[in-house]
């Protein structure tokens, strides 16, 4: 009686969640480790090394580093890039989908990454903009459910990517131009407001520009 639902992707430990702006001349010596890591470019461009391969990633590009793959990242010297870097443990076969692939994120996936960063600020007692930080201590009292939401958003992010690239949907041009229903737009506006509020709360001690918001 009842069903035990199957998890297609099961996450273990979270090792790092970072969002930071590199200097335009930043250079990292590289590393390898026995867990997954991905790098997503939110602004600018970077030169990423995967094993012996070099690739220039631009805004919206996403690259996965499989366990034990040597990798590093360097700014190109032109634009100071903003990056999301998340590393985590996962042993599911579904993760082989990401081997040696460079992907482009869509708006849903971009929002999921933003949600992960927001929840990380709610539960980790450290800065998220230190690329060399290896230990992420938890706050003594974090927001209820923040740790679980990180896991859920990250699972959603990975599943959404696999689904979208495995079964691409081509929408008719007419549908693409159709204005969103008012109910949908209202929900979207509320979500944007909440996200801006969260951002401002996490930057109370810094000068925030309109472009950043």
Regions found by a protein language model. Give the residues of each.
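A short hydrophobic beta-strand segment most commonly corresponding to one strand
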Residues: 64, 78-96
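Short, locally clustered residues in the helix-turn-helix/winged-helix DNA-binding domain
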Residues: 42, 87, 117, 162, ...
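Generic protein-terminus/edge-of-domain signal
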Residues: 1-62, 68-69, 76-77, 96-97, ...
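N-terminal intrinsically disordered/low-complexity leader segments
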Residues: 1-8, 18, 169-182
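A short, Lys/Arg-enriched amphipathic alpha-helix from helix-turn-helix/homeodomain DNA-binding modules
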Residues: 171-213
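A generic "structured core" feature
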Residues: 36, 49-50, 57, 64-66, ...
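An amphipathic alpha-helical interaction segment
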Residues: 86, 107-180
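Double-stranded beta-helix
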Residues: 90-111
């Amino acid at each position: 009686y009842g069903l035990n639902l199957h998890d297609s992707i099961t996450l273990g430990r979270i090792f790092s969640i970072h969002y930071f702006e590199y200097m335009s001349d930043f250079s990292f010596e590289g590393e390898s480790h026995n867990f997954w890591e991905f790098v997503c470019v939110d602004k600018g461009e970077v030169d990423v090394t995967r094993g012996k391969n070099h690739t220039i990633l631009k805004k919206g590009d996403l690259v996965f580093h499989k366990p034990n793959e040597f990798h590093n990242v360097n700014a190109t010297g032109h634009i100071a890039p903003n990056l999301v870097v998340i590393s985590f443990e996962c042993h599911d076969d579904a993760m082989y989908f990401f081997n040696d692939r460079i992907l482009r994120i869509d708006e849903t996936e971009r929002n999921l990454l933003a949600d992960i960063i927001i929840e990380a600020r709610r539960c980790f007692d450290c800065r998220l903009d230190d690329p060399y930080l290896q230990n992420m201590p938890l706050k003594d009292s974090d927001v209820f459910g923040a740790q679980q939401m990180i896991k859920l958003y990250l699972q959603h992010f990975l599943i959404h990517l696999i689904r979208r690239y495995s079964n691409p949907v081509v929408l008719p041009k007419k549908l693409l131009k159709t204005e969103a229903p008012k109910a949908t737009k209202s929900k979207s506006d509320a979500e944007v407001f909440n996200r801006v509020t969260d951002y401002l709360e996490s930057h109370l001690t810094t000068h925030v520009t309109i472009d950043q918001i």
